[in-house]
Amino acid sequence: MSDISKYAGIFPAFYACYDKDGRISPEAVRALARYLLDKGVKGLYVGGSSGECIYHSVAERRLVLENVMAEVGGRLTVIAHVACNSTADSRELAAHAQALGVDAIAAIPPIYFKLPPRGIAKYWNDISDAAPDTDFIIYNIPQLAGVALTIPLLKEMQKNPRVVGVKNSSMPVQDIQMWRDEGVIVFNGTD
């Protein structure tokens, strides 16, 4: 397991940045990353809900992350959300994120079809395997993903040595304490 101290502090969700024509703006991405760095945040969570990840193509998601890393890579801890409806696309984004040097990747469970816990674990582990030198963070957002992280599923995922934490967007304080008691880092936020 990596040095988890790099995950202490404030990690804002990175918002989507567009130009006047509605396309990803590399300049605006870099400006926002620089602004957040200058404000003293410890890290960034890139490509999550606030980043409108589900609506972006793989190419757009790569472009955002490339520009974030070009601006703040090595100076901030960067977590890249890489989940897509396609496991292959998720794996591509995971490998790309690792190649760029992110600190961790994260993923929501598969959406639309509700998979059993073993199917969710396989999906997450397949993604994690595409970035074998990168930490993995489970993104728990049941109000949008349609499935909540359970302790048995968390324990199954903890068999993967790359799993270091949970990004919790489900809000109940009991969840935060429950997962912390299981020895994982918990990021909490509604994004």
Task: List each language-model region with its residue ranges.
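Active-site beta->alpha loop and helix N-cap motifs at the rims of alpha/beta catalytic domains
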Residues: S2-G146
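Catalytic alpha/beta core domains of metabolic enzymes, predominantly
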Residues: S128-P132, I141-D191
